[in-house]
Amino acid sequence: MRVKDPSKDLPEKGKRNKRPLLPHDEDSSDDIAVGLTCQHVSYAVSVNHVKKAVAESLWSVCSECLKERRFCDGQPVLPADVWLCLKCGLQGCGKNSESQHSLRHFKSSGTESHCVVISLSTWVIWCYECNEKLSTHCNKKVLAQIVDFLQKHAFKTQTGAFSRIIKLCEEKREAGEIKKGKKGCTVPSVKGITNLGNTCFFNAVIQNLAQTYILFELMNEIKEDGTKFKISLSSAPQLEPLVVELSSPGPLTSALFLFLHSMKEAEKGPLSPKVLFNQLCQKAPRFKGFQQQDSQELLHHLLDAVRTEETKRIQASILKAFNNPTTKTADDETRKKVKAYGKEGVKMNFIDRIFIGELTSTVMCEECANISTMKDPFIDISLPIIEERVSKPVLLGKMSKCRSLQETDQDHNKGTVTVGNAHQPRASRKHSSPNDKNQLSHDRKHLRKWPSEEEKTVVTHPKNDNLEASPPASTLSTEASLNESLTDGSERDASLESSVDADSEASEPEIASKQPVLLRSRGDSCGHAEQHPHLPLASELPQAKETHGGEEEMAEAIAELHLSGTVTGNRDFHREKQPLNVPNNLCFSEGKHTRLHSAQNAFQTLSQSYVTTSKECSVQSCLYQFTSMELLMGNNKLLCEDCTEKRRKCHKETSSAEKKAGGVYTNARKQLLISAVPAILILHLKRFHQAGLSLRKVNRHVDFPLTLDLAPFCAATCKNISVGEKVLYGLYGIVEHSGSMRGGHYTAYVKVRVPSRKLSECITGRKTAAGLKEPDGELGGHWVHVSDTYVQVVPESRALSAQAYLLFYERIL
């Protein structure tokens, strides 16, 4: 039995039951009074329309703000205060927001009243006509019924469920295009990419590759195991086309394709690039450790590694078609066929078809007027930025011998004629010797290229810096299987570029070789040389030293069946190198070495030269400087073998030792022009260079156009282009570097647009679906700024004001 605690009183039930009911609060009483007097509820509320609209739209998202496609951290940047129209169910931001879409909807409703709205966060009902709050008690149970439905719907809706956002945007955009007669043309979306730790350099490049629509299209064609691949031989029409079955793509290629595919899916938010980045780190270990890296180096390693995988894939399929021949089983006829098909097949990999161009270096001896050209492939063009500073005057006395030639040939282009010695880095001039007479200007290093197989003939010995060139690939013997002749170019480059920014000018002022060499091909980290009887130049030797890192791999490859040596032509760009001896009777393939007899045609461009203005700093002015004519004199003189041979003939009585040492160095002119344009043009603005013992960044703004005409910088012999024809490119991607050398951040500006049908037809060689119409002139679209997971639509002017580091242009046909 419990005893009552005298300190506690039992509740008095009677008194509690008799207590009068009080209103919840004063506000609710006011709401009732106001609601009872509102005359708009009866015809400004529709339960059926609201239920239908809520079921078809995203919850608590302003539909108008959604059309602007503003995102942050992969989620839409939308106002928290969203109001729903109780007449039609439209959701818009409140009157306290910046856009006030809900209020605008009410004002633009016309004759039909849309004045009653409800806040989806506070459940406050408001009448724009009365400018007062309403209560759910007015007009019987209509408002109470709607509020109850909306609250239940909000409870069922998961917070942060924005998976349908981009999908709805694309459906609306596609519906609008169908009305305009553009059915089937969809605008890809833009998603943020998670930063794994100092991987903004990677994210910015991937964002631009994701907007390179032709890349995904070509990868999609050959993504599966067993894909049919047809190889036709234009050089050997007597051989029938070969149809091979490709194996599965390599791990990096597969990871890249899957990631680009995920970037196009509408159901996902920010993506994690962990799988793709890990695959790249396996090919290029230098990117491990989540350290700050360079975007351009990342781009080259990525494309090079993917190209290596595709090359091996194509070569393996060709060997499989011939039952995997070996040294013992393959006869001469089989070897010739494998080499012929391999040479043409490797050129069909999608990296070469999209990104690779060709640059021609033309050098003319001023004494004998002999002209020679050398063609180098490139993946991008690195352009130095001219800083606003007063230059030291050049001693004109050293130029007296070339002044008349400069004035006659370049009268309309005076500013482009440069003296090679004047542009030589200070460090190079300091360490140069009298034997450096054949040293080229360091501007030769401004182009980043992939060498063709016939050019990969340099072996550098660190002790004596001798260069040895190999015979043409056609003279090489066949020893083992084709797929064993390849090495991983990406891993080799990782060791070459692990300590220095390969694309900054910091790597340029290196000590020049003291021994003359034959010829150095263009390139920064993938240096190769070929013997060139008319252009023995020495300044490129420091770059050639970089090839020593892969010498052991090359020696092993040569010991096997060397079929890769002949699977390349002028547009073939293997990264492997073959350390072979130089025969005295070395023959050169047609196209690699050409004698020209007309100086006027040698330096002719497709159109008139670009005219720069005072203090101009633009992409055009940088290209103008890059392709301007140089005078090779002083320590940069040309060792002309024609002049040397003529002098030897005049002194037949001299000894053989004197003949060997009696080289003739002459003044020469040199110019670089583009001889084959790529489908996708990548320009690299060299913002990082060496200042003393440290690196510094050039922060000067460089103007870049939306539409670039490349014709003034192309040779008159440019492939598939007639003289006078324009070579137009449209800007679609920017990689921006903000900050300094010690701490910076990479972001991307990409143009979301309709894929170019004409460019696709040109590269793939087939017609697209009939009835598709492509807009005349520039394709429409909008610019998006992407900083890791932050995505925001920006005006075109903001994109053009970016501090560009990489520029992506696509060909306009």
UniProtKB/Swiss-Prot annotation:
Residues 1-27, 405-552 are annotated as: Disordered. Zn(2+) 3 binds at residues 85, 88, 105, 114. GO terms for biological process: cell migration; DNA repair; neural retina development; photoreceptor cell maintenance; protein deubiquitination; proteolysis. Residues 1-62 are annotated as: Interaction with ERCC1. Residues 191-812 form the USP domain. Zn(2+) 2 binds at residues 62, 65, 93, 101. SMART domains: ZnF_UBP. The active site is at 200 (nucleophile), 745 (proton acceptor). The modification Phosphoserine is found at residues 28-29, 507, 525. Residues 472-488 have a biased composition (Polar residues). CDD domains: Peptidase_C19K (cd02667). Interacts with ERCC1. The catalytically active form interacts with SPDL1. Catalyzes the deubiquitination of SPDL1. Plays a role in the repair of UV-induced DNA damage via deubiquitination of ERCC1, promoting its recruitment to DNA damage sites. May be involved in the maintenance of photoreceptor function. May play a role in normal retinal development. Plays a role in cell migration. This is Ubiquitin carboxyl-terminal hydrolase 45. It comes from Mus musculus (Mouse).
